């Protein structure tokens, strides 16, 4: 079976940054399973998989615009500390989910000053070209329910135990996808800008 829209695909992969740093992988014995054609992977990888079959191995370089986008300076904001309600200590690297006009947005603290902090809403891989090494492990026809929902169904939830909540970008899992699993804190009203952040 060739990979095409509405085919469920299992892939083993490694993904590295331009400087060779391994940022994610799924081995053959624990492959990533997804539904093709529903934006469950970064678009550059999904396009490269189109027409492939079980046993195919390949490498593909994915430009930022077909991965996690270019780095956007407008996604970096300085906000007052007092909007982070219920957080005892703010430190660089803390992650929050900000409720914005465009929906939930993951942000990370990149600087902490006396009265304010800098938060960055860019994806950690924004602006980077990614190298994927991929092997197609299995394919099957999707169920009507999977097609209707736009993602696979399996015991334990999406991708082996994760729930169906997702960020604004998609429903997949793993670095090759857009799924977001950081739920430590929640920010409200525009990237922690107006209302506040809380657990």
From Swiss-Prot:
Ni(2+) binds at residues 173, 191-192, 197. Residues 1-69 are annotated as: PPIase first part. PANTHER family: FKBP-TYPE PEPTIDYL-PROLYL CIS-TRANS ISOMERASE SLYD. It is an enzyme of class 5 (isomerase). Its EC number is 5.2.1.8. The keyword DNA repair does not apply. This is FKBP-type peptidyl-prolyl cis-trans isomerase SlyD. InterPro entries: PPIase_dom_sf, PPIase_FKBP_dom, SlpA/SlyD-like_ins_sf. The N-terminal region consists of two globular folded domains that contain prolyl isomerase and chaperone activities. One of its GO terms (molecular function) is peptidyl-prolyl cis-trans isomerase activity. It comes from Pasteurella multocida (strain Pm70). It is found in: Cytoplasm. Residues 76-120 are annotated as: IF-chaperone.
